Regions:
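Active-site- or binding-pocket-proximal scaffold segments within functional domains
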Residues: 1-417
Length: 417
């Protein structure tokens, strides 16, 4: 048995000095042959990675970011790369860990949904992976409720039975005699993005903005963790919450041993990249809390990390002979303003009222103007202790969306190493 760890970054993150929490986690992972259990590790920087740090390439990366968030541009390549890695490395009994930030968080949720629907084909059939993804997306467009798992699934000894003649994904799984692994752990920072899918029932506008199948609920996931940003307000960065509660099925085709899925979604102070990382290191103290929380949760689920690297990257302990320094977590860390001028313009574009979260926004003719709409945090949500300490020590920090009733999540405890 081994761990297979997939790390998918947000659009525009790359291996440089201003690194995201996904890349910091990747660097903390034990990857040597001596690691017990062995860990096979995959990292994808995401769409829009900067090849050159000049104005043109930054503009191009930002354009790809908007396009990717709005339409899912580039998602297929990211999903197929990670899926192919799993195809070649998975063996029965292995534990699959999926991590992602931003658009990369949605990527791993799509990957988990794809595995639930078509399974994991054998290595000698990897050339068919693209066809499987097409079938999965067609199923998503013909079955809108599948995004939230609101579908019934039946099977026989050869695999899943197609729901109808349009369920090409189930037919694909039967033809390829696929494997059916479960997903041991999904850990995401601030999932955003949607996908435009074709709709045969739309005559004038032949597409709609939808969730791909099993990206909001997925019974093949055992443990789900999400770190969410309290202070993000950009309309293009709406949080994709996970349905809670839902069930986990050990056997894809048998409900007999189903059990409640282990789910926790925790809110942290800051905007999107204050939670997922990626700002200059000297301004990244807030992002260390969601990083440490995720590392602790994943370690409890069996992930193996190097404690000295965790101490350096997450706790800010200077490592001997290292030319790099990293900040420690601080409740007084910089909280960035992500609403730059370019993003601000998009706040005045009308959106369908079905996406409205904040009650103070007025609806006219089925639409509303987001205009820095706060994220809705429900009563009973999990709020990290660092948020409450920041409120207590900083009089100017008063998030308007903090619920009246919530559960506290304690601060991390520094270990040895």
């Amino acid at each position: 048995m081994k761990n297979i760890v997939i790390c998918c970054d947000g659009t525009g993150n790359e291996i440089n000095e201003n690194i995201s929490n996904v890349l910091k986690l990747y660097r903390c992972l034990r990857k040597t042959e001596k690691t017990t259990p062995h860990q096979a590790v995959f990292y994808d920087p995401g769409v829009g990675t900067l090849a050159q740090p000049d104005t043109w390439h930054r503009f191009k990366a930002n354009f790809n970011l908007v396009l990717g968030l709005a339409t899912g541009y580039g998602l297929d390549d990211n999903v197929l790369s990670a899926y192919s890695f799993l195809v070649h490395n998975y063996e029965e009994g292995d534990r699959i860990f999926l991590f992602g930030f931003s658009r990369g968080a949605y990527t791993v949720r799509v990957l988990a949904g794809l595995i639930h629907k078509i399974g994991l084909i054998s290595p000698d059939q990897v050339n068919l992976a693209g066809s499987g993804l097409v079938a999965y997306k067609q199923y998503s467009s013909s079955t809108p409720k599948a995004g939230r798992g609101l579908v019934s699934e039946t099977s026989d000894e050869d695999g899943p039975l197609p729901a109808d003649r349009f369920d090409l994904a189930a037919q694909f799984a039967r033809i390829t005699s696929t494997r059916w692994p479960t997903i041991h752990f999904v850990g995401v920072w601030d999932t955003v993005a949607s996908v435009i899918v074709p709709r045969a029932d739309r005559f004038f506008v032949g597409f709609s903005l939808e969730e791909l199948a099993f990206t909001i609920a997925n019974p093949s996931v055992r443990i789900f963790r999400q770190a969410a940003a309290i202070d993000e307000r950009r309309c293009m960065f709406r949080l994709k919450a996970w349905t809670d509660p839902q069930m986990f099925r050990h056997n894809r085709f048998n409900d007999a041993h189903a059990e409640p899925q282990d789910i926790r979604q925790v809110w942290f102070a800051g905007v999107h990249s204050d939670v997922g990382g990626g700002y200059p290191e000297k301004d990244s103290a807030l992002s260390k809390y969601p990083l440490l929380w995720m590392i602790d949760e994943a370690m409890a689920a069996g992930l193996s990390v190097n404690p000295r690297t965790v101490n350096q990257l997450a706790w800010g302990v200077q490592r001997k002979n290292s030319p790099f320094s990293y900040v420690a977590p601080s409740i007084r860390g910089m909280l960035h303003d992500s609403m730059t001028a370019a993003w601000r313009l998009l706040e005045f574009l009308p959106k369908s009222a079905t996406y409205k979260e904040w009650p103070q926004r007025q609806v006219h003719f089925g639409c509303y103007i987001p205009d820095r709409e706060p994220r809705f945090i429900p009563d009973g949500a999990h709020i990290h202790e660092s948020v409450l300490m920041r409120i207590a020590e900083m009089p100017d920090y008063r998030p308007v969306n903090l619920p009246a009733a919530y559960e506290r999540v304690p601060l991390p405890v520094k270990g040895d190493g």
